[in-house]
Regions:
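Short extracytoplasmic
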Residues: 13-39
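N-terminal membrane-anchoring alpha-helices
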Residues: 1-14
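Acidic/histidine-rich helix-loop elements
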Residues: 17-26, 50-58, 83-86, 120-130, ...
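Conserved beta-sheet core of the metallophosphoesterase superfamily
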Residues: 156-233
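Core catalytic region of metal-dependent phosphoesterases/phosphodiesterases
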Residues: 29-108
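Active-site neighborhood of phospho(di)ester-bond hydrolases with catalytic His/Asp-centered motifs
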Residues: 20-22, 43-49, 72-79, 100-102, ...
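Binuclear metal-dependent hydrolase catalytic cores centered on His/Asp/Glu-rich metal-binding motifs
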Residues: 90-95, 108-150, 159-161, 221-223
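Active-site-proximal beta-strand elements of phosphoester/diester hydrolases
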Residues: 15-25, 109-119, 150-154, 207-213
Length: 239
């Protein structure tokens, strides 16, 4: 498990440390918890795909329960949550984590919002080549809130289409799984972006942070692409 560290300076009220964990897809919870504890975060942020499907969700639920015992834990809804036959939001809420289903809350002076995957309207996930749109009305309303705003948004491909022109300070995403196979610093494929995707890992335009994620939803292995969690430190700018 790789811990990737990013440090940004911005208009936060105080320095804050977030552990960012994405795309669990049934990955065993113990190594993820150990890595989270190593980062000593103020809170844990999970931008979707805690659950894989009806047959593979228990490890993700266990991780959420353990995280919520030790840290404030905030979760948004990814596309795989909608592969559950039961209500995924209710299931996630039972863990004690704060589930942000097109909602926001405040933590340490930071407004944390969760933009739900557009697959809520396409639960069979027939849009293989493109991603259904999110709730743009909620997104617009969130962007108008005063203060420093962090958006948990599972799909990085939403950024150019719906988010780039919004007044949102930081966007945290996953979904691309680092491009699955990585060669010469580039990923090969990402769902919703296709071959040679633009957004696979790292920081883009100074405000879109994309995690490689932890698990693997495909039968194809990850190559040159270790599971990662991110330690994101946001430091208060000096005036």
């Amino acid at each position: 498990m790789k811990i990737t560290k990013y440090a940004l300076k911005s208009k936060v009220e105080e320095n804050v440390r977030f552990a960012v964990v994405s795309d669990l897809h049934g990955y065993p919870s113990a190594p993820v918890l150990n890595a989270i504890r190593e980062t000593e975060p103020n809170a844990v942020l999970i931008p979707g795909d805690v659950i894989h499907n009806d047959n593979n969700y228990k490890n993700g639920i266990e991780l959420l329960k353990e995280c919520a015992k030790d840290y404030p834990t905030f979760v948004s809804i990814g596309n795989h949550e909608f592969k559950m036959s039961s209500d995924p939001v209710a299931l996630l809420k039972e863990t004690g984590a704060t589930v942000l289903d097109n909602e926001y809350t405040e933590f340490m002076g930071v407004k944390i919002g969760g933009l739900t995957s557009g697959y809520t309207a396409d639960k069979k996930q027939t849009h293989f080549g493109s991603t259904p749109p999110p709730n743009t009305e909620w997104l617009k309303a969130f962007s108008k809130i005063e203060g420093y705003k962090v958006l948990l948004c599972h799909h990085p491909e939403y950024y150019p289409a719906y988010i780039r022109d919004k007044n949102i300070d930081l966007i945290l995403s996953g979904h691309a799984h680092g491009g699955q196979w990585r060669f010469f610093g580039r990923g090969l494929f990402a769902p919703g972006q296709g071959i040679f995707p633009k957004y696979t890992c790292g920081i883009y335009e100074g405000r879109l942070v994309v995690s490689k994620g932890v698990g693997n939803p495909h039968f194809i292995p990850r190559i040159n692409n270790k599971p990662e969690i991110i330690l994101l430190t946001i430091e208060k700018e000096e005036k």
